[in-house]
Each structure stands twice: as structure tokens, then as C-alpha cells.
């Protein structure tokens, strides 16, 4: 017989550095999920990834207090900042202050990496979404 799902929880956790401190501990603890078990499983699953990379994770927890989790790709903003080699986007996007520039080839590589997490029908649609995110961060797309 299948386990009865009690709920789902979405968190964004840095790769390789899940620990019981806030925000992870309280979010899991109030739902009765074993915090240390999640931290160990998540850190083991992300040990090959770049340390500190933000990973969205969807935790499905069951009435018997067990859980499963699915990791997604890092947010588009992470990839954009990494490709443009900047720490943060523009404070005033669209007002003339550019935070950096990206080429269409860089946007396409980000789109290919994020394709399964985006609700785009094809790579062109995914690129359009990513270009919109880039403009919102004050990045200019050239090429």
C-alpha cells in the first residue's frame, strides 16, 4: 500500500551546506521531519556540486514522518550572475545603469541547462524567458 502524503515543502538550500539551523531546521521540525536525516541525505546528494550553489528542493513528507526530496536546477539569476561574473544585478534596472553584458550564446547555454525546469515549449521560448530575467537584473544581451 502506498504511503499517505501529508504535504510538500519547498526550500532553497545551498549545496553541501544543509544544517539544522534556520531556515531549514524550523521548517522541517514543525512538520515532524527528521532534520538531521534530511541534512545528511541532501549533503550527500549535493557533494559533487559546486559548494554554496543555491538548490531549490521540493520535500514530500508522509504521515509516517518519512520523506523524499527532489532537487531542481539553481535559479536563473544564479546562472546569469555566474556568466556575467557579477555579484548582484543593477540597483536600477532599465534606467540606464547596466550591471553587465551577456551574449546570446551564454543565454542559450543557460536555457539548455534550465530547460527541464522552465515551462517553455522549445529552446527559443526558454531563451526569451532568460533574456527577460537578464533585463530585470540590469544585464544587456548582445549578439
Swiss-Prot record:
Q: Name one GO cellular component term.
A: cytosolic large ribosomal subunit
- Function description: Forms part of the ribosomal stalk which helps the ribosome interact with GTP-bound translation factors.
Write down the PANTHER family for this protein, in alphabetical order: 60S RIBOSOMAL PROTEIN L12 (PTHR11661), LARGE RIBOSOMAL SUBUNIT PROTEIN UL11M (PTHR11661:SF1)
UniProt protein name: Large ribosomal subunit protein uL11
> Ribosomal protein among the record's keywords?
yes
Tell me the gene name.
rplK
Q: Give the family from UniProt.
A: Belongs to the universal ribosomal protein uL11 family.
SUBUNIT field: Part of the ribosomal stalk of the 50S ribosomal subunit. Interacts with L10 and the large rRNA to form the base of the stalk. L10 forms an elongated spine to which L12 dimers bind in a sequential fashion forming a multimeric L10(L12)X complex.
Q: Name one GO biological process term.
A: translation
Write out the PTM section of this UniProt entry.
Answer: One or more lysine residues are methylated.
GO molecular function terms noted in the UniProt entry: large ribosomal subunit rRNA binding; structural constituent of ribosome
Q: Keywords, A to Z?
A: Methylation, Ribonucleoprotein, Ribosomal protein, RNA-binding, rRNA-binding
Amino acid at each position: 500500500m502506498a504511503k499517505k502524503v501529508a504535504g510538500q515543502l519547498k526550500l532553497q538550500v545551498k549545496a553541501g551546506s544543509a544544517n539544522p539551523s534556520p531556515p531549514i531546521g524550523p521548517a522541517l521540525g514543525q512538520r515532524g521531519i527528521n532534520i538531521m536525516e534530511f541534512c545528511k541525505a541532501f549533503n550527500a546528494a549535493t557533494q559533487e556540486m559546486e559548494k554554496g550553489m543555491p538548490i531549490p528542493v521540493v520535500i514530500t513528507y508522509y504521515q509516517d514522518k518519512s520523506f523524499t526530496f527532489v532537487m531542481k536546477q539553481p535559479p536563473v539569476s544564479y546562472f546569469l550572475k555566474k556568466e556575467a561574473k557579477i555579484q548582484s544585478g543593477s540597483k536600477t534596472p532599465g534606467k540606464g545603469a547596466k550591471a553587465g553584458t551577456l551574449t546570446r550564446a551564454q543565454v542559450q547555454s543557460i536555457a539548455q541547462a534550465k530547460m527541464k525546469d522552465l515551462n517553455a515549449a522549445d529552446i527559443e521560448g526558454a531563451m526569451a524567458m532568460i533574456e527577460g530575467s537578464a533585463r530585470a537584473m540590469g544585464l544587456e544581451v548582445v549578439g
